[in-house]
From Swiss-Prot:
The active site is at C395. Catalyzes the formation of 5-methyl-uridine at position 1939 (m5U1939) in 23S rRNA. It comes from Yersinia enterocolitica serotype O:8 / biotype 1B (strain NCTC 13174 / 8081). Keywords: 4Fe-4S, Iron, Iron-sulfur, Metal-binding, Methyltransferase, rRNA processing, S-adenosyl-L-methionine, Transferase. This is 23S rRNA (uracil(1939)-C(5))-methyltransferase RlmD. InterPro entries: 23S_rRNA_MeTrfase_RlmD (IPR001566), MeTrfase_TrmA_AS (IPR030390), MeTrfase_TrmA_CS (IPR030391), NA-bd_OB-fold (IPR012340), SAM-dependent_MTases_sf (IPR029063), TRAM_dom (IPR002792), U5_MeTrfase_fam (IPR010280).
Length: 443
C-alpha cells in the first residue's frame, strides 16, 4: 500500500468545523478542503456535509475526526462486518464497491500522470466478489490471565490491541466457518497461555492452519488438534519457531492456475484473492502475446504463479527470484507439471541480470512482479535486454510510476494500465501495466 502522507503527528488545539467532502482518497478517507488545505476524514464520503473535529494539522494537510453527518450520499452502505470501525482489517466497508474502485483508479491515474508524464485511459478494473474473497489470514492470539480467556483476532485500528473476531465476511466462507470452532479448540489447549498466532489458508484441496506455539506442545494438545482437524477437515501445521513448520495432519496444499497445479508450502506467499489472481495471470498472458519461438523472463517470480503458465506458450521461460525456498518450489512444480522448458534461478535481483549466463540469448518479453519497494535496481538491466514487451505487476502505485520512467526514457510506450481490486474494502491499490517497444529501440 502506498504511503502518500507522513504518519508523524503534531498535537493541536481541537477545532470543530463543518465541511463538505469532495472526494475519497485510496485509503477510504473522505477529502474536504478548508482555507486551501486538504482535510482527511475517515468515515466521510464524497457529497456529504460533516461536522468534524480537527485532530492534527500539518503545513500541507490536516486530519479530522467525524463527529456528525449532516447528510448521507447515495454511495454510503451499511458495513457487512459487525467489527468494522474497530478492527483495522478493513477501512472502506461504508462505501459501495463502485466508489471504492473509482477512487483508487483515479488515484492511480493521477499518480502515474504526475510521475511518468503520461497515462493511457485505464482499462476496466479487474475484480471479483467484494466479500468472501480472502483465502489467507493471520489472527493474533493473546491470553488474558485476569479474565482467564484467550483473545483471537485482528489488530484494532491504529493500535496493537486485538479485536476478538468470531465473524469476518471478507474471508472465504470455508475459512470463516472455522473461526468459532478454532477458537474453542485453542481455548481448551493446555498451552493456551503460550500461543503466538494462527494462520488460515484455503488451498484448492481444502483449508489448512499453521499454529505458532511458544513451547513444545504436550501430547494431549497434539491429540486435541488432530481431533479438531478431523472434525473440521482441516490440515494442521505446527510452528514451534519462526523458521520451521511441522505437518501434524493433512494433505500438502496446492492451487490451480491456467490448468496447472502448483503445490506450495503453508507459509509460501500466494495471492490472497484467487479470483483476481486468475484474471491477472490471464491478462498478463494476453498482454505479453507470447509466441511459440520466444524466450520470456519472469522477475520476482516467486514459486511460478506467472512463470509456469507462460511456459505453456513460450519456447523457454526463465524465472528469477531472491528467495531460495520459492525457487525450489518453482522447480518442483515445473517438474510435476511436465514443463521442461522453464528454469528457475536464485539471484540477487539488484545485480546486473543482463550479464548472467541464462540471459546471453536475450529475451523477447519480460514480466516483473516486485514487492512494495518496486524494482529501481532492475529497470536499467531490463532496458539492456531490450524486450519487445514488458508487463509490470505492482502492489505500490508510487514505485510503479517511478520505475516506469526508466522504460519511458528508453523509448518504451506505456500502452495499457489496469487496476486490480485485489483487496476490496482496504487501502491496498494493486495494478498492472504494459510497456511496448517503440520503433527505433534496438533489439
Amino acid at each position: 500500500m502506498a504511503q502518500f502522507y507522513s504518519p508523524n503527528r503534531r498535537v493541536t488545539t481541537k477545532q470543530t468545523l463543518t465541511v463538505t467532502v469532495n472526494s475519497l482518497d485510496p485509503f477510504g478517507q473522505g477529502v474536504a478542503h478548508h482555507q486551501g488545505k486538504a482535510i482527511f476524514i475517515p468515515g466521510a464520503l464524497p457529497g456529504e456535509q460533516a461536522e468534524i473535529e480537527l485532530t492534527e494539522q500539518k503545513r500541507q494537510y490536516s486530519r479530522g475526526k467525524l463527529k456528525r453527518l449532516l447528510n448521507r450520499c447515495n454511495e454510503r452502505v451499511v458495513p457487512a462486518c459487525p467489527h468494522f470501525g474497530i478492527c483495522g482489517g478493513c477501512q472502506q466497508q461504508h462505501a459501495n464497491s463502485q466508489l471504492q474502485q473509482m477512487s483508487k483508479a483515479d488515484s492511480l491515474q493521477r499518480l502515474i500522470m504526475r510521475e511518468a508524464g503520461a497515462c493511457p485511459q485505464l482499462d476496466p478494473v479487474i475484480c471479483g466478489s467484494e466479500y468472501g474473497y480472502r483465502r489467507r489470514a493471520r489472527l493474533g492470539l493473546l491470553y488474558q490471565p485476569k479474565q482467564h480467556r484467550l483473545q483471537m483476532g485482528f489488530r484494532q485500528t491504529e493500535s496493537h490491541d486485538l479485536v476478538c473476531i468470531k465473524h469476518c465476511p471478507v474471508l472465504r466462507p470455508e475459512l470463516e466457518r472455522l473461526l468459532l470452532p478454532l477458537y474453542q479448540c485453542l481455548s481448551g489447549l493446555q498451552a493456551v497461555r503460550r500461543l503466538g498466532h494462527v494462520e488460515l489458508v484455503l488451498a484448492d484441496n481444502g483449508p489448512l492452519m499453521v499454529l505458532r506455539h511458544l513451547d513444545t506442545l504436550k501430547e494431549v494438545d497434539r491429540a486435541a488438534l488432530i481431533d479438531f482437524a478431523k472434525r473440521e477437515q482441516v490440515a494442521v501445521y505446527l510452528a514451534g519457531d519462526s523458521d520451521n513448520v511441522e505437518k501434524l495432519i493433512g494433505e500438502e496444499p496446492y492451487y490451480q492456475i491456467e490448468g496447472l497445479r502448483l503445490a506450495f508450502h503453508p507459509r509460501d506467499f500466494i495471492q490472497v484473492n484467487d479470483t483476481v489472481n486468475q484474471q491477472m495471470v490471464a491478462q498478463a498472458i494476453a498482454w505479453l502475446d507470447v509466441q511459440p519461438d520466444e524466450r520470456v523472463l519472469d522477475l520476482f517470480c516467486g514459486m511460478g504463479n506467472f512463470t509456469l503458465p507462460l511456459a505453456k506458450l513460450a519456447r523457454e521461460v526463465v524465472g528469477v527470484e531472491g528467495v531460495a525456498a520459492l525457487v525450489a518450489n518453482g522447480q518442483y512444480n515445473a517438474l510435476n507439471n511436465a514443463l521442461p522448458n522453464v528454469s528457475f534461478f536464485h539471484e540477487n535481483l539488484e545485480s546486473d541480470i543482463s550479464r548472467q549466463p541464462w540471459a546471453t540469448q536475450g529475451f523477447d518479453k519480460v514480466l516483473l512482479d516486485p514487492a512494495r519497494a518496486g524494482a529501481a535496481g532492475v529497470m536499467s538491466h531490463i532496458v539492456k535486454l531490450a524486450p519487445k514487451r514488458v508487463v509490470y505487476v505492482s502492489c505500490n502505485p508510487t514505485t510503479l510510476a517511478r520505475d516506469s520512467q526508466v522504460l519511458l526514457a528508453a523509448g518504451y510506450r506505456l500502452a495499457q494500465v489496469r487496476m486490480l481490486d485485489m483487496f476490496p474494502h482496504t487501502g491496498h491499490l494493486e495494478s498492472m501495466a504494459l510497456f511496448m517497444q517503440e520503433p527505433g529501440v534496438a533489439k
